Amino acid sequence: MHNIHRRHFLKAAGAVTAGLVTANIALNANASSVAPKPRVGKSVIGLIAPKMELVRVGFIGVGERGFSHVEQFCHLEGVELKAICDTHQAVIDRAVEHIVNQNRPKPAVYTGNDLSYRELLNRDDIDIVIISTPWEWHAPMAIDTMESGKHAFVEVPLALTVEECWQLVDTAERTQKNCMMMENVNYGREELMVLNMVRQGVFGELLHGEAAYIHELRWQMKEIDHKTGSWRTYWHTKRNGNLYPTHGLGPISQYMNINRGDRFDYLTSMSSPALGRALYAKREFPADHERNQLKYINGDMSTSLIKTVKGRTIMVQHDTTTPRPYSRHNLIQGTNGVFAGFPNRIAVEHGGFGKSYHEWDMDMQKWYDKYDHPLWQRIGKEAEINGGHGGMDFVMLWRMVYCLRNGEALDQDVYDGAAWSVVNILSEQSLNNRSNSVNFPDFTRGAWEHATPLGIVGA
């Protein structure tokens, strides 16, 4: 979606910052020292919506990420693209043109102001809404979507405060609507293969994971009026913590059955100095440019350590500033061996095709041949053709539609989105309290202990 005018961002971000200060004082940096309020509805773990012969879709935000979803949905069967909403006419025109060029009916359009999306939500011919907007709008739009009787599918992160996480959970439980944060990396070929290997016991009992979003994005600072950098840059002036934890953390969480037999217990976090963005601004912009007037406070490298209730450990890192190759780490260590990503490599004590665990096995093909996930076996070629981060976007959307049309539970629920996203807030709370540990809220209200782990779903 087109960037919200700066005053809207500053107002929203200011409220977030004020909320964090209040939370730190009230909770002494302990996010779950206050017991959750009683559940209003019922748990949505394993929620199955009534089968939909045709999935009717509305889109809020069709800029960069949102337009990618429009493109992918045009390749899916059993869907209708009913309506789109954005505040920027150019991206609306592009989306409409693309949909029509794909021989699909012209969608209805909603625009004009930041709340025009509510007109889209008033329609009674939409089943699900895809939300691809600046971060501060994710939770409010998802809540409004569920309140309107529709299922919400939200870009990452799901929320920016602990309170927003609880509001999303409470709304999903009360309305019995899906609220899925669309963590696409969980549908990558490597990630799904590793999930299959974990479920088959290849790595033994799991002990430790490492997750990251290391992606040099300083160039986005040059996006001043439109596109992601026009609003995302400001978050580096408002928070010091892990701004974007879910891409790496999502897969590790599913490997470890987080919220389905285990859960995050507490976190400790620290950050490096915040130097890189100011240096980049000084080098790339005139001295009097706005980018040189900002005070960048988010540490160039954020590192958090999570302890789970079962005693496992997870390292989570965030760095979108320093010059280095892309990585999500994607490391999972068990009693029989380890998988690590970027580049992909495996070492196991038993069952390693004769390779010693003292050296990495970099030849992935034989592992794919044995452990490739059924979803990628079924639609991998189609995913590679249609693209979207190597095909993971297509697999995710395909799977979402499949579940809705066949009466199956989604692979990710509101509790997952809340638990993975809340690292954003808790990392800052820990850092502001000399890296003392901060407890995770139990968004499942205890239901994690008996929830069924995600299986190796087919198609």
From Swiss-Prot:
Spans traversing the lipid bilayer: none
Hydrolase is among the record's keywords: yes
Signal peptide (UniProt feature, chain positions): 1-31
Positions contributing to substrate binding: 213, 232, 244-247, 326
Superkingdom, taxonomy of origin: Bacteria
PTM annotation, UniProt: Predicted to be exported by the Tat system. The position of the signal peptide cleavage has not been experimentally proven.
UniProt KW Ribosomal protein keyword: no
Keyword terms: Glycosidase, Hydrolase, NAD, Signal
Co-factor requirement: NAD(+)
Residues noted as binding NAD(+) in the record, renumbered to the chain: 64-65, 86, 135-138, 155-156, 184, 244
UniProt-listed InterPro entries: Gfo/Idh/MocA-like_OxRdtase_N, Gfo/Idh/MocA_oxidrdct_glycsds, Glyco_hydro_109_C, NAD(P)-bd_dom_sf, TAT_signal, TAT_signal_bac_arc
Enzyme class, first EC level, given as a word: hydrolase
Cofactor binding, note field: Binds 1 NAD(+) per subunit. The NAD(+) cannot dissociate.
PROSITE patterns xref list: TAT
SUPFAM superfamilies the record matches: NAD(P)-binding Rossmann-fold domains
Disulfide bonds: none
A family per Pfam: TAT_signal
EC number: 3.2.1.-
GO MF assignments: hydrolase activity, acting on glycosyl bonds; nucleotide binding
Protein role: Glycosidase.
Family, per entry: Belongs to the Gfo/Idh/MocA family. Glycosyl hydrolase 109 subfamily.
Protein name: Glycosyl hydrolase family 109 protein 1
Native organism: Shewanella sp. (strain MR-7)
